[in-house]
Amino acid sequence: MYQLAGRHKKRVHKSVVVAVTALVVGSIGCVATYRFWPTELPKPVVVAKPQARAYAVSAQSNTLFVGDVYTGRSVNVWAQASPLKYAYPFSRLSEFNRGSYNAWIANLECPTVAGLHLTPVQEEATLSFNCDPGYLPELAKWFNVVTLANNHTDNQGVAGFAETQQHLTENGIQYFGHPDPRQVNDLCDVIALPASVRMSDGKTVDGDLPVAMCGYHGFIRLPSPEAIAVMNEYSAYMPVIAMPHAGTEYKAAPDALKTNLYRSMIDNGADMVLGGHPHWVQTTESYKGHLIVYSMGNFIFDQQGSLEVTRSAAINVQFNVQGADAALLAKWLALGKTCGTYHDNCLVQAKAAKLAKLPFAFKFGVVGADDSNRITRPASPAVQAGILQRMNWTETMSQLQAPYFSL
């Protein structure tokens, strides 16, 4: 019995040892598992799909066309007597809310030859103008494009005209037109018109729309039918804006000769005609549903004798492209990047690529200006009302036809 009991005790002891050992090993395993096994299952790897590249869905250029701009003669005297110097003629243009526009376009009414300083008496006696190139950096802060098709840009001869073009290029100002309408190859140019481009992701980016602008000087001699017909080549592909400089000065309405000339521009492909030269605001009309402005008047000038010569009508034109094929719009915007230099080959490129014309719509408004007391600024309500009345604006707007509309 004693021996049996002893063996039994040994077996119990061994069982206890085995159980304790198993418990310890199990505990160590649990600790190891707790320490080395992740507390959470690994998250599945998600491969991000490449985002679709945003593309242009629409484009708009809010542009202001103004009348005659001249910084010579008395304007120069006033400016140089002012602490603002070359900035003086432009010192209140901020009141027009320049930031709300993509572009400003003007008629530059003088050559810019360096070192040629004429007094007001000299300029008045000969009506041969020159403007100091020192004004161009200030002009460039406001204006993107100018027309050179008028009766003064050639006042300093062929060399003076070429120098003017050079100074404009140096200051980043695009230009078009020629003082001699017989220079048929120099009348129209494709301009890179700054625009706001709406993208498919909702963002808005800057872009350029190719637009043809044609300048016609018709004061000395009328442009020939051949010169007017040049616009047809451009109008098959893009919008065409005609900016003629013609007619009798200091009149409230055009004569029959001028009326027929400007209407012929519409007949030959112009979307609109925005005229200058008479120094007064003149009437407007809707011709075949298109807008003709016979004269916008003086925007920056030294004439101060009456309200007629100090008020002017700036024409706000909205160029809208909506509903265009995305691929077609992308091609035109890509082309626009190459249209910022004089006599570029943008029309040739458009023809070679067989680009279809974009579906443009145009909206028009009038922004009155007043340069009495020597500084150009927005017109008062009374002056604005007089401008609209002279232009018979309400009637003209009511007679426009699609794609031309009132703002």
Regions found by a protein language model. Name each.
Residues 142-145, 256-315, 321-325:
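Conserved beta-sheet core of the metallophosphoesterase superfamily
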Residues 65-67, 103-109, 143-151, 176-179, ...:
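Active-site neighborhood of phospho(di)ester-bond hydrolases with catalytic His/Asp-centered motifs
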Residues 42-149, 153-157, 164:
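N-terminal catalytic scaffold of extracellular/periplasmic and nuclease hydrolases
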Residues 114-138, 238-270:
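Active-site-proximal segments of metal-dependent phosphoesterases and phosphodiesterases across multiple
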Residues 76-91, 125-126, 190-243, 249, ...:
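Binuclear metal-dependent hydrolase catalytic cores centered on His/Asp/Glu-rich metal-binding motifs
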Residues 43-44, 48, 54-60, 253, ...:
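A short C-terminal boundary segment appended to hydrolase-like catalytic domains
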Residues 1-15:
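N-terminal Lys/Arg-rich, disordered targeting/topogenic segments
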Residues 72-74, 112-115, 151-165, 182-188, ...:
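Active-site environment of divalent metal-dependent phosphoester hydrolases
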